[in-house]
Amino acid sequence: MHPKIMVVDDEPDTIDLVKIILESENIQVIGASSGFECLELMELEKPDLILLDIMMPDMNGWETFHKIKERNPALPVAMLTVKSQEFDKMLGLHVLKADDYITKPFSRKELIKRTRDLLGTKAG
């Protein structure tokens, strides 16, 4: 069975780009355009990994991250964001304990490698 990831981003182009890249690697991609949609779809779709934007209207990525972890502490969540300052990375990785912190723009190779690393043995 192919691994399934959810991309949560209010920019449809980002979801489409991730989908094109990862589906070429036999990784199923579900898009969600908000934190609220992510939380709804999470129960239904049961993703193996969530790639989560930080800057979104209504519920930002940090709030969404906390709600995801409350519901499913073992589910890997990587931040996928334009916020590339060292402070933001430290906050994401060391304070909030995100599983990874991927900054936009990312390369195809980087996204595939980091997604596979996060999925562990499920990818391939």
Regions from the language model: what does each represent?
Residues 56:
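Receiver (REC) domain active-site loop signature in two-component systems and cognate sites
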Residues 45-51:
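Active-site beta3 strand of CheY-like receiver
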Residues 105-116, 123:
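C-terminal output helix
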Residues 63, 84-100:
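Alpha4 helix (beta4-alpha4-beta5 surface) of REC/receiver domains from two-component response regulators
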Residues 16-24:
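Charged docking surfaces used in two-component/phosphorelay signaling
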Residues 26-33, 41:
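Short hydrophobic/Thr-rich beta-strand motif most characteristic of the beta2 strand and flanking loop
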Residues 33-37, 60-63:
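Acidic catalytic/metal-coordinating carboxylates
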